[in-house]
């Protein structure tokens, strides 16, 4: 196997939307970094039955809704 071609694999802390934390290993960030999730299995509509609203980060959702608002409307 070639040396120095694999990314650094280290421990990070993942912070869920409800504040719970767990330690896992990842190539993301640096050793000991915290990854704060905006959405997870406890808050994603696919796992909660679609009752929660989507977060509009940077206006992306509202731009999408504006662009495609009349897409499926029948005249």
Curated annotation (Swiss-Prot):
InterPro entries: Ribosomal_bL28/bL31-like_sf, Ribosomal_bL31, Ribosomal_bL31_A, Ribosomal_bL31_sf. Keywords: Ribonucleoprotein, Ribosomal protein, RNA-binding, rRNA-binding. Disulfide bonds: none annotated. Gene3D superfamilies: Ribosomal protein L31 (4.10.830.30). GO terms for biological process: translation. GO terms for cellular component: ribonucleoprotein complex; ribosome. The keyword RNA-binding applies. PROSITE patterns: RIBOSOMAL_L31 (PS01143). The keyword Repeat does not apply. Transmembrane segments: none annotated. One of its GO terms (molecular function) is structural constituent of ribosome. SUPFAM superfamilies: L28p-like (SSF143800). Binds the 23S rRNA. PANTHER family: 50S RIBOSOMAL PROTEIN L31, CHLOROPLASTIC, LARGE RIBOSOMAL SUBUNIT PROTEIN BL31A. Part of the 50S ribosomal subunit. Belongs to the bacterial ribosomal protein bL31 family. Type A subfamily. This is Large ribosomal subunit protein bL31. It comes from Rhodopseudomonas palustris (strain BisB18).
